[in-house]
């Protein structure tokens, strides 16, 4: 089941639990706006290249739309649509005043020079500048993009609208970025895991973790979990997978990855088949890579007692059912990985106020939001007698439905 079908399925299940009528259901499901633009740029060799860019603006009932821009050769309109919808529910679960959006350009960043990436970003911004804005739609980095990409968008947008640092988040600190933003999603995963384990009478200390994906989110989560006494027993990334049942030295691994661009060849652990990473013996599994990696083919072999979804849509609905029967507790993506968008909200607030928070305040506020979010999800689970995924979906959908109704949009 693809990401859009799975997201729609979860929405429909939540809608039924909430008793929403069909008219309101359709209002919530259909995107506010879908944008498709053609971006033609001169390449460094003088030739012209054309790329297709997308931006799906899903919902703005609770505030400006919010979501990343990804640069990837397989940017798919259906996936962008699904991720935009997920952002709507995610921001509602986090209880921050945003709706959902997502965008991307079908390109391979590694095949483009820095100057070509800059030209592409600026042309894309020129095409959509009148459809985004501080109080309209606020982009952020995603797969294949970074703070420099956001700096180019900010600069190009400002040519049309005046200096507007709050138009994007995930910016460099020197242009109004927030302290703590780089670690935010990974730190949010730590706080989410802490809340889940605490609810089951456990703590991070002494638990064995497996982390699939060692990019920004996975590496920060692993580092912070280790600092809290957790043991990382296996890690994987695009280069390979490693395992050490006694615990991997994450500080040494981070140094190795920086020098070698991947976990492959790390001497402090044994090399294993990357396809086996999800079924390694552990207490907590953290998928922090791509979507759809936990499916009906491997779900039956998963040994973890808890799954904390750091990636977007890592678990197929068929796998959900198999894991539920095994008693595996899944903390869903729309709560577990909301730390990034929450600190993006803090960045936006700081930009609008023209006042910078220190990192301690950012992290303290993030922990408070994550703890409140977990309590709110659990309350919905009790109300509707459902699992954590449906608890999160009913929480998010209900908040958006109430805002939609109050604004008179469902009529």
UniProtKB/Swiss-Prot annotation:
Keywords on record: NAD, Oxidoreductase
Record carries keyword DNA repair: no
Swiss-Prot/TrEMBL catalytic activity: L-glutamate + NAD(+) + H2O = 2-oxoglutarate + NH4(+) + NADH + H(+); L-glutamate + NADP(+) + H2O = 2-oxoglutarate + NH4(+) + NADPH + H(+)
Active site: 102
SUPFAM superfamilies: Aminoacid dehydrogenase-like, N-terminal domain, NAD(P)-binding Rossmann-fold domains
GO cellular component: mitochondrion
Example of a GO MF term: glutamate dehydrogenase (NADP+) activity
InterPro entries in the cross-refs: Aminoacid_DH-like_N_sf, Glu/Leu/Phe/Val/Trp_DH, Glu/Leu/Phe/Val/Trp_DH_C, Glu/Leu/Phe/Val/Trp_DH_dimer, Glu/Leu/Phe/Val_DH_AS, Glu_DH, NAD(P)-bd_dom_sf, NAD_bind_Glu_DH
Entry EC number(s): 1.4.1.3
Any one GO BP annotation for this protein: glutamate catabolic process
PANTHER family tied to this protein: GLUTAMATE DEHYDROGENASE, GLUTAMATE DEHYDROGENASE 3-RELATED
Record family assignment: Belongs to the Glu/Leu/Phe/Val dehydrogenases family.
Name of the protein: Glutamate dehydrogenase B
Organism of derivation: Nicotiana plumbaginifolia (Leadwort-leaved tobacco)
């Amino acid at each position: 089941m693809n990401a859009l079908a799975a997201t729609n399925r979860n929405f429909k299940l939540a809608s039924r639990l909430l008793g929403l009528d069909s008219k309101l259901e359709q209002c919530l499901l259909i995107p506010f706006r879908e944008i498709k633009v053609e971006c033609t740029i001169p390449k460094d060799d003088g030739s012209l290249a054309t790329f297709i860019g997308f931006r799906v603006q899903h919902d703005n009932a609770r505030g400006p739309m919010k979501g990343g821009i990804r640069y990837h050769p397989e940017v798919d309109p259906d996936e962008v649509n699904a991720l935009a919808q997920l952002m709507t529910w995610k921001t509602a679960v986090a209880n921050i005043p945003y709706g959902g959006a997502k965008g991307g350009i079908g390109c391979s960043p590694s095949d483009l020079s820095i100057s070509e990436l800059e030209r592409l970003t600026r042309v894309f911004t020129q095409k959509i500048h009148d459809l985004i804005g501080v109080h309209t739609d606020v982009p952020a980095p995603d797969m294949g993009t970074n703070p420099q990409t956001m700096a180019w968008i900010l600069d190009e947008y400002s040519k049309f609208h005046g200096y507007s640092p709050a138009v994007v988040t995930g910016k460099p600190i020197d242009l109004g970025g927030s302290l703590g933003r780089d670690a935010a999603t990974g730190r949010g995963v730590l706080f989410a895991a802490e809340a889940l384990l605490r609810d089951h009478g456990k703590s991070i200390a002494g638990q064995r973790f497996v982390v699939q994906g060692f990019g920004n989110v996975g590496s920060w989560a692993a580092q912070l979990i280790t600092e809290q006494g957790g043991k990382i027993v296996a890690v994987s990334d695009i280069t390979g997978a490693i395992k050490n049942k006694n615990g991997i030295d994450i500080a040494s691994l981070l140094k190795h990855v920086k020098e070698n661009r991947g976990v492959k060849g790390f001497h402090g652990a044994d090399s294993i088949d990357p396809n086996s990473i999800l079924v390694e013996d552990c207490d907590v599994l953290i998928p922090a890579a791509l979507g759809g990696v936990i499916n009906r083919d491997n779900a039956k072999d998963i040994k973890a007692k808890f799954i904390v979804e750091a990636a977007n849509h890592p678990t197929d609905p068929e796998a959900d059912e198999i894991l539920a029967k095994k008693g595996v507790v899944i903390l869903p993506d729309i709560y577990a990985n909301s730390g990034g968008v929450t600190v993006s909200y803090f960045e936006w607030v700081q930009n609008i106020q023209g006042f910078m928070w220190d990192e301690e305040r950012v992290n303290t506020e993030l922990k408070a939001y994550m703890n409140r979010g977990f309590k709110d999800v659990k309350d919905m689970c009790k109300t509707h007698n459902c699992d954590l995924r449906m608890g999160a979906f009913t929480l998010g959908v209900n908040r958006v439905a109430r805002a939609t109704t109050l604004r008179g949009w469902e009529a």
